[in-house]
Amino acid sequence: MAKKGNRVQVILECTEHKTSGQPGTSRYITTKNKKNTPDRIELKKFNPILKKMTVHKEIK
């Protein structure tokens, strides 16, 4: 029987958007390798509501 893959889907949510007071959220879905990166990831992604690059952290 084949093993399951190490890749899982994770959701990234903007950290700066909560403090801005504007409605809505900026979220991205990506995949990560559990064995190579066991901790939560942080990536700089574009937030279309704030119209700038912001730090997005893994949630859940």
UniProtKB/Swiss-Prot annotation:
InterPro entries: Ribosomal_bL33, Ribosomal_bL33_sf, Ribosomal_zn-bd. Keywords: Ribonucleoprotein, Ribosomal protein. GO terms for cellular component: cytoplasm; ribonucleoprotein complex; ribosome. The keyword Ribosomal protein applies. One of its GO terms (biological process) is translation. GO terms for molecular function: structural constituent of ribosome. The keyword Chaperone does not apply. Belongs to the bacterial ribosomal protein bL33 family. This is Large ribosomal subunit protein bL33. It comes from Christiangramia forsetii (strain DSM 17595 / CGMCC 1.15422 / KT0803) (Gramella forsetii). The gene is rpmG.
